[in-house]
A protein has these predicted regions:
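Juxtacatalytic substrate-recognition/specificity segment
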Residues: 2-130, 215
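Acidic/His/Gly-enriched intrinsically disordered linker/tail segments
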Residues: 84, 112-116, 128-245
């Protein structure tokens, strides 16, 4: 399945690639190393994180094949062109940037690629620490990754919908966000940001490490109604979001 790939190893990182994508190996490795160091410190890991294996695949067909057969993640085939990365345990399948123009909706950007790898590394770390990752709400997992990777600061897909919602006084309810994958990416990070701003990083770590049933609000000690009202008020007055507009 992956026998035909070339491999680059450095410390606890292993990157698979084909020859035409060799030019992306170093930046992939460096970004993974930086992400592991940064977020191991954030999540207060007491021991070294296990080795991570990333595979740069050359096209959409190979991406779908490895996601299904190697990672055992059931996705639509052919997958949506907005899918360019899929983590599972300590493996990460990445559509190589050389295939973006033909097989994705994205244009390659060095900075956005680094933030993407940070985003996916957060998913890997969350799965490693979580008592039951399958129960984790999508808004929480994606919100955590968008927030800590700082994609929300620089990428319009995550920031603009929130700015528009604030300005038009149409911020969705959390139940609505949970039911809509798109809203999970757009608004999940604002909920995580509010939690960290209000309750501190210790609460983020508590949720990641102890939320086994998916009830984030039980861990916080708030009803969803009370929490939602305070979060929406926070958004209306959160200047930092506008500072990056």
């Amino acid at each position: 399945m992956i026998e035909s790939y070339l491999w680059f190893n450095e410390e606890n990182i292993k990157v698979g690639f084909i020859e035409k994508d060799r030019k992306f190996v170093k930046e992939t490795t460096v970004a993974l190393k930086e992400a592991i160091k940064l977020f191991s410190e954030y999540f207060l890991l007491e021991k070294s994180f296990p080795p991570i294996r990333a595979i740069l695949v050359p096209n959409r067909k190979e991406y779908d094949h490895l996601v299904k057969e190697l990672l055992k993640v059931d996705i639509e085939r052919p997958s949506n062109p907005n899918r360019i990365a899929q983590p599972q345990r300590t493996d990460l399948v990445l559509l190589a940037p050389s295939a973006y123009s033909t097989d994705s909706i994205y244009e390659y950007s060095v900075k956005e690629y680094k933030r993407l790898i940070f985003h996916e590394t957060i998913h890997i770390l969350e799965e490693y620490l979580s008592p039951n990752i399958e129960a984790s709400p999508r808004w929480w997992g994606e919100g955590l990754a968008v927030y800590l990777s700082e994609q929300w600061k620089y990428e319009d897909d995550f920031r603009v919908p929130v700015l528009e919602g604030i300005r038009s006084n149409s911020i969705p309810e959390i139940e609505e966000i949970q039911k809509d994958v798109r809203l999970c990416y757009q608004y999940g990070w604002t909920i995580v940001k509010y939690i960290e701003s209000t309750y501190g990083r210790k609460m983020i770590l508590n949720i990641v490490k102890n939320c086994a049933d998916g009830d984030v609000f039980d861990i916080i000690g708030e009803t969803i109604g009370n929490f939602e009202g305070e979060w929406q008020k926070y958004l209306q007055n959160e200047k930092e979001i506008f500072n990056f507009a």
